[in-house]
Amino acid sequence: MSNVQGLTRSALDEDDELFVGYGFLPSIFPYRMQDLYDRSEELTPYVGVVLENQYLKALFLPELGGRLWSLYDKVAGKHLLYDNPVVRPCNLAVRNAWLAGGIEFNCGMVGHHPFTCSRIHAAETKLEDGTPVLRMYEYERIRKVVYQMDFFLPEGSKLLFARMRITNTTPYVTPIYWWSNSKK
């Protein structure tokens, strides 16, 4: 707001408010809350998928939303991401359960997406040159979109490649929000 000659005037144009709240989710339905966890330290096995070459070793956890849990630099001998030794959910996501560690990939809505602590689909495919690709994907039921994440680590590469795709399955414009986060 600005004050011009004693009058209060909005800094927004008259059409700017049309999109205030656009895409806001009043409910997480049809997903159920994930609040049946505790803060105990019991061991729980998770299935991991590894992409590795002479420079890097990447560990993904499809059971925890496809999170890149670990990225290890073999030459420097160090972890490039926050190396959390435990998986301990807490109430920070749209379905409650969220955990710290690695890189989280979020699709569909503001806030940690519905699958941050849920299993998503994982498959192996290949690039045209034969490079293995880890493909993880899921159908997000609120936005009605399919999102796909492809990761590959070619021989001789010092870079882990990520290719993301979001497909709208409806004939309508769908508000979408994509973000990733990590801590080092």
Where on the chain are the PLM-derived regions?
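Extended, loop-rich substrate-binding clefts of extracytoplasmic carbohydrate-active enzymes
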Residues: 15-43, 48-52, 100-159
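Short Asp/Glu-rich motifs
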Residues: 70, 92, 112
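Catalytic cores of glycan-processing enzymes that make or break glycosidic bonds
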Residues: 6-12, 47, 134, 161-165, ...
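Acidic, contiguous internal or C-terminal segments within carbohydrate-active enzymes
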Residues: 38, 52, 58-76, 136-183
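Intrinsically disordered, low-structural-confidence terminal and linker regions
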Residues: 1-5
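Polysaccharide-binding surfaces and accessory modules of carbohydrate-active proteins
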Residues: 76-105, 131, 161, 167, ...
